[in-house]
């Protein structure tokens, strides 16, 4: 998962929301660890000032899936990157297609951000 640029690891829901709201762009998204369900991830998407969160998990066989709107057929993907690519298209069961990845910026110092704290959210928005 660490190879996925939009994966922010163990950040809080509040931190994820702040990062997305700071972009001000509908369709901005990131992935983070779920705070309530171990081993599950959250795909967080900004739309009209609200953050929509979809649980993403890996099956025992290694496939990836996301919880989407009721009535939408559940799909499975071999790689998390394939799941993200699929949700960049319209009508996939999420509020808006994924458009603007909020990537975790690699730190110049391997584990510390600009303030010297390990939890510093060094991020940047990648626009198409």
Curated annotation (Swiss-Prot):
Entry keywords, A to Z: Acetylation, Adaptive immunity, Cytoplasm, Immunity, Innate immunity, SH2 domain
Coiled coil: none
Region (Disordered): 104-128
Segments for region (Interaction with FYN SH3 domain): 67-92
Domain of life from the UniProt record: Eukaryota
Record field: compositional bias (Basic and acidic residues): 116-128
CC per GO annotation: cytoplasm
Subunit organization: Interacts with CD84, CD244, LY9, SLAMF1 and FYN. Interacts with NTRK1, NTRK2 and NTRK3.
This protein's name: SH2 domain-containing protein 1A
Annotated source species: Bos taurus
């Amino acid at each position: 998962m660490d190879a996925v640029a939009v994966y922010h690891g163990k950040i809080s829901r509040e931190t994820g929301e702040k990062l997305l709201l700071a972009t001000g762009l509908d369709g901005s998204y990131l992935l983070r660890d779920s705070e309530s369900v171990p081993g599950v991830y959250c795909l967080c998407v900004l739309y009209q000032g609200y953050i929509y969160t979809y649980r993403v998990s890996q099956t025992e066989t290694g496939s990836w899936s996301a919880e989407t709107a009721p009535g939408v057929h559940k799909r499975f993907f071999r790689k998390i990157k394939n799941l993200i690519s699929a949700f960049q298209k319209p009508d996939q069961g999420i509020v808006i297609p994924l458009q603007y990845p909020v990537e975790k910026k690699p730190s110049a110092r391997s584990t510390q951000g600009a303030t010297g704290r390990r939890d510093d959210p060094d991020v940047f928005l990648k626009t198409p």
